[in-house]
Amino acid sequence: MGKHIIPQRRGHGSLVYRSPSHRHVVDVKHLKPGEYVVKDIIHAPGRNSPLLELVDSTGKKVYQIAFTGAYVGQKIVAGNVDTINPGTTTVLANIPDGSYVYNIESSPGDGGEFCRSAGTFALVVSHGSRVTLKLPSGSMRDFDPRCRATVGVVAASGIIDAPILKAGTHVHYLRSKAKRPYTVRGVAMNAVNHPHGGGNHQHVGRPSTVGRNAPPGRKVGRLSPKRRKVNGSK
């Protein structure tokens, strides 16, 4: 009897494949309208960008994704404001063209979905019935003017330039994101572990195309590929 393949194990949801959410600081959403002071800049497990630990007028702690240039003691404003500074959170209708923004809402009130990882930002291109932003991928996307965003660029833009140096460091980094630190090819496995495994040399040994409705244990290889057209055929 064969063993479950990796997608089946991941779908089962054991601790190996589950994100260690008990280590995460908080699920970062947009700030409520008001004034805040940066108390500290902290590391957040599972994220590649730091977080700002903020304090409001009542002394309550809240968190925000850090932006480039933030410092302890800095004052940050959220809501409808006249002056736009880095770290200000407001609706897109109030942010002028040419500004860099991050943590952009997809729909008003969802807390932010776009441009949240280290070094990312979007460019405000134009205003109208919809606000047009240029995303990091280069694509243009229209947003509701009531969607909120934070002015600035997400901090830690140089994270991809810093070498990891040690394999163990990379393992812990990926496990905090519930990702596997390595990948083993199916043809390199034994026949009991994968449909492509086994044999005297590494080869699939069968057609690698599988149907869209194949069961999970057999759904590996080229999934429901389109039919290849031959020259001269209709």
Curated annotation (Swiss-Prot):
Stored InterPro entries: NA-bd_OB-fold, Rib_uL2_dom2, Ribosomal_uL2, Ribosomal_uL2_arc_euk, Ribosomal_uL2_C, Ribosomal_uL2_dom3, Translation_prot_SH3-like_sf
Quaternary organization: Part of the 50S ribosomal subunit. Forms a bridge to the 30S subunit in the 70S ribosome.
The family this protein is said to belong to: Belongs to the universal ribosomal protein uL2 family.
Composition bias type Basic residues, residue spans: 219-234
Stretch list, region Disordered: 195-234
Highest taxon, organism lineage: Archaea
Gene Ontology CC terms, in alphabetical order: cytosolic large ribosomal subunit
Keyword Transit peptide: no
Name of one Pfam family that matches: Ribosomal_L2_C
Gene3D superfamilies linked: 2.30.30.30, Nucleic acid-binding proteins (2.40.50.140), Ribosomal protein L2, domain 3 (4.10.950.10)
The keyword rRNA-binding belongs to this UniProt entry's keyword annotation: yes
Alphabetized NCBIfam families for the sequence: PRK09612.1
An example molecular function term from Gene Ontology annotations: structural constituent of ribosome
A GO BP annotation: cytoplasmic translation
Organism expressing this protein natively: Thermoplasma volcanium (strain ATCC 51530 / DSM 4299 / JCM 9571 / NBRC 15438 / GSS1)
HAMAP family, per the entry: Ribosomal_uL2_A
Keyword terms: Ribonucleoprotein, Ribosomal protein, RNA-binding, rRNA-binding
Protein role: One of the primary rRNA binding proteins. Required for association of the 30S and 50S subunits to form the 70S ribosome, for tRNA binding and peptide bond formation. It has been suggested to have peptidyltransferase activity; this is somewhat controversial. Makes several contacts with the 16S rRNA in the 70S ribosome.
Protein name: Large ribosomal subunit protein uL2
